[in-house]
Structure formats: structure tokens, C-alpha cells
Amino acid sequence: MTPQLATTICGIALKNPVLAASGTFAYGVEFEKLVDLNALGGFVVKGLSREPIEGNPPPRVFESEAGMINSVGLQNIGVRAFVAEKLPALAGLRTAVFANVFGYCTEDYVEVVRVLNDHAGLAGYELNVSCPNTAHGGIYFSNDPVLLAEVVTAAKRVATRPLIVKLSPNVSAIEPLARVAEESGADALSLVNTVISLAIDARTRRPRIGAGFGGLSGPAIKPIALRFVYQAARAVRIPVIGLGGIATGEDAAEFLIAGASAVEVGTATFWDPRAPLRIAEELGKFLEREGIRKATDLVGTLKF
């Protein structure tokens, strides 16, 4: 019997639990000639801000030993250009499309969500809280429970679609922050974002990234991500979406076992744009080999 991959997140039906992550899948439409977008479990468009952002100086990407470091600087066309130029092409898709939202103050997040509310074609929002709050001395929303509660509460108040809060691994403990996000209105969590890192060129004695520090992603962070997903899933009652170094169907299975209800694939799409589809197929084969009828039967089954 063919295993069932279908699942739901916040009442949103997904064909399978494998989504393309924000930041590596552009606005989705750019991949339509390479990937059957309707076959995806879903995808998250790259982060959207109140106004266009040009991003950081080059070099922006460095390939590390087991992943990559990037500091693109959240370059994007801005939310208004997105709804005018990109969203119309997404509105007819038969898969779940999520908009990643970020800002540098609470009002930024609220305004982006308000603009998106007025347009069809989206299943929900993913709030990237791994950004510095410029009104509070650059403290990251994701690292401060008070700021996290403020931005999630404000976004939830205006959102007309489910709200997923994307948490950072650059914290000492994830459970308190996961609970704050849930108590402030999050409908689901996604984690982890990238790990703040530094790569150095020994010959020039300069960083290999133009902005200095960057975010590490890929296989190197998978064990870190699994730990955080497991801890967050045990701390909250809302669904958790896992990401961080997923490149195979068995990787995806590990995240489900840790407690994730779905997963997102990011860095792997750089060398294989069809990675989310391949991973979903491999997950199905893994379930079949293991005699598991449904992907949902794996969720939260880790044994100690």
C-alpha cells in the first residue's frame, strides 16, 4: 500500500509535508519551468518588507565544509511590488503558498501583513523574527521574550490568515520563546533559522562575507535543528515545522520523529531546485520500507 503523505498545518491542507523554505525559492514563479509548483507540499516566498531593500555588499555567499554561509541582507522588492508583480501568478496555484514577513520594528510587520491581507493567493504568513529591532537598540525580536510577544501579538491582531512564527537557533533555550510565541497568538512555529557564523580568509585576514558575519545553513546545522525542534515541539501545543540541513527523505523523517508536523527545505534547493519534490518522494519510500501507513504516524515518535 502506498503511504499517505498528506497532512494539515493550521487547517491548511498540504499534499505532502515537504515545503520549499523562504530565501532559497525566490518568489516561487521563478522556478515554475524547473519545478511543478503544484506538486509541492507548499512553499514560502522570500522575505517581504515594508519597502524595497537592496541587501548587503558582496560577497554574499560562501560555501563552507558542510553547508553555506550567506548574508544576502534580506534583499527584496517590497510588499507592494510583490502583490502587484508576483502574487497574481501565484493565485491560481493548487498548493499552499506562504509569505515570509520581516521588519525592523513592530509597525513594519503589521504594515506588511495588512497589505497582504487585501490580496488572494496566500495560505498564511511566516513571521521572521530573527531581525534586529532598531527601536530597541538592535536587540533581536527572536531573542527577547518581551519583544517577541509584542511583535507576534501585533501581527496576529491584524492577520486574516494563519500565522507561523519562525524562531532562531541563536538562543540559549528555545522552550520559553516557543511558549511566548504560542501564548501571543502563533498558529504554528517554524525552526530553525540560520546559525550566526564567521568565515575568514587566512591570506587576506578578512571575512569571506562582505557584511562580516553570515547565517550558516545546510547539513552542518541539522543536529542543532533537530534538538531545537524536539524541544519546541514538547513545549507547545501548536504544530512545529522543522528546517535546517534537510537534503534527503530520511532527513525529513528524522524531523517528523523529533516532533515536526512538516518540514521546509532550503539550502538543498541551491544545487537541486527539485529537492523538495525528491525529498517528498524519498520520504514516501522510507515510509513504505518501514511499513508506516501515514507520514503523520511518525510525528513525535522519538524514543529515549
Swiss-Prot record:
Pfam families to which the protein is assigned, alphabetical: DHO_dh (PF01180)
Where are the active-site residues found?
C131 (nucleophile)
Record EC number: 1.3.98.1
GO BP terms: 'de novo' pyrimidine nucleobase biosynthetic process; 'de novo' UMP biosynthetic process
One GO molecular-function annotation for this sequence?
dihydroorotate dehydrogenase (fumarate) activity
Report the InterPro entries cross-referenced here.
Answer: Aldolase_TIM, DHO_dehydrogenase, DHOD_1B, Dihydroorotate_DH_1, Dihydroorotate_DH_1_2, Dihydroorotate_DH_cat, Dihydroorotate_DH_CS, Dihydroorotate_DH_I
One GO cellular component term, please give it: cytoplasm
Job description of the protein: Catalyzes the conversion of dihydroorotate to orotate with fumarate as the electron acceptor.
The record's comment on protein family reads: Belongs to the dihydroorotate dehydrogenase family. Type 1 subfamily.
Q: Please report the name of this protein according to its UniProt entry.
A: Putative dihydroorotate dehydrogenase A (fumarate)
Query: Which organism is the protein's source?
Result: Solibacter usitatus (strain Ellin6076)
Organism lineage reads as: Bacteria, Pseudomonadati, Acidobacteriota, Terriglobia, Bryobacterales
